[in-house]
Amino acid sequence: LATKRPIILRTFWLLSNREFAQSSGVQKLPRTFYDRDTICVAQELLGKWLVHKAGGVERVGKIVEVEAYLGEHDLAAHSSKGRTERTKIMFGPPGHAYVYLIYGMHHCMNVVTERDGHASAVLLRAIEPVKNLAGRTQGPGLLCRALGIDRCLNGHDLLSDDFFIVEPNVAEKISIVKRPRIG
């Protein structure tokens, strides 16, 4: 059986970052967006806005770097060792957040993709600040810190009203660079 090659996707914006437009008119990504091939989802997440509303503050970041994990056959994926208490979210339905702690101090967020039981996900590696974000956002741990994402959001439905991904209401032309995953 041929396996898909793991990749990191990073965007390089051809247009300058635009002022955040009011949230009216933006649509949450539907469940069907996530219930597709992981590499397709990873590519199409680039340029989307990740929104987390907490404590009366709406934080928004534009997704600019992602990494695809392709299920149990992908030895770099947490799911490669089978279903565990930690990884059970990856085996669940698409469109949910898989959030975990690394090195005992940094949270990382993945978006679960493909059908229930497939155990694939896309790691969000970096965002560009759009609204109410301060500090660095380049790297999975810094992204989560800036958006206030922690293990309390593990398993959270990304179609909820407080944590979701949207298509921005202004399309931008982007160029996508694919690179082999490191490590």
Give the predicted meaning of each segment.
Residues 23-183:
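Conserved, well-structured core segments that form or line functional sites
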Residues 7-8, 26:
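Short hydrophobic transmembrane-like helices used for membrane targeting/insertion
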Residues 2, 19-21:
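Acidic, Ala/Val/Gly-enriched low-complexity intrinsically disordered segments
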